């Protein structure tokens, strides 16, 4: 098995894999593997389910009372960034491709009555506006997807690469675009995906 892994990953890759497995076992025991480097801030508010797997460059930011919750068997690939000041929940058996950004907050509310959202105020000085994000079970987020505050993604949803997701997405659909729209629905009677 060791020779098979060394052949698959190459010598340097195999050494990194062994290092990452050892560090994961020491710091994140219920996780399958977290590939380093990773950047986890406020890990007391970040909960990993069983068999969590990550690629390199994972960045998790739980600011203030923010919570990030991963259910079991979640896999995130390289350079995923998740930021929370309220709540981000990711359901079991979910796959997140590389370079995905998920956030539950904005720098400013951009409402007519909010003077703190003025373009004359630097973005990092604006009032943070938040709304919880919930990603269901068996969801697949494609490469470079952005999930915005207040989004609720139902179970079994597939999100196409480069999509921007906001709002409530019904279960068992395929969505894509900017903003993401439903392009297919799963028909449980025929057991086929059908155009929306």
Curated annotation (Swiss-Prot):
Record EC number: 2.3.1.-
Q: Which UniProt keywords apply?
A: Acyltransferase, Lipopolysaccharide biosynthesis, Repeat, Transferase
Biological process GO annotation list? lipopolysaccharide biosynthetic process
Part of which pathway? Bacterial outer membrane biogenesis; lipopolysaccharide biosynthesis
Entries under InterPro entries matching the protein: Hexapep, Hexapeptide_acetyltransf, Trimer_LpxA-like_sf
Any GO CC annotation of this UniProt entry: cytosol
Annotated family = Belongs to the transferase hexapeptide repeat family.
Mind telling me what this protein is named? Putative lipopolysaccharide biosynthesis O-acetyl transferase WbbJ
């Amino acid at each position: 098995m060791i020779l098979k892994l060394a052949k698959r990953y190459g010598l340097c890759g195999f050494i990194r894999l062994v290092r990452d497995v050892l560090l994961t076992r020491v710091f994140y025991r219920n996780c399958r593997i977290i590939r380093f480097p990773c950047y986890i801030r406020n890990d007391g508010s970040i909960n990993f389910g069983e068999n969590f797997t990550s690629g390199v460059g994972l960045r998790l930011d739980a600011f203030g009372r923010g919570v990030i919750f991963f259910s079991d068997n979640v896999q995130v690939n390289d350079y995923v960034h998740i930021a929370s000041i309220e709540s981000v929940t990711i359901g079991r058996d979910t796959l997140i491709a590389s370079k995905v950004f998920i956030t539950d907050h904005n720098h400013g509310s951009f409402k007519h009555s909010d003077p703190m959202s003025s373009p004359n105020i630097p973005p990092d000085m604006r009032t943070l506006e938040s709304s919880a994000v919930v990603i269901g079970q068996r969801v697949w987020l494609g490469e470079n997807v952005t999930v915005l505050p207040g989004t609720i993604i139902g179970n079994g949803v597939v999100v196409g690469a480069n999509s921007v997701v906001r709002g409530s997405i019904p279960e068992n659909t395929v969505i894509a675009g900017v903003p993401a729209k439903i392009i297919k629905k799963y028909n449980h009677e025929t057991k086929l995906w059908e155009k929306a």
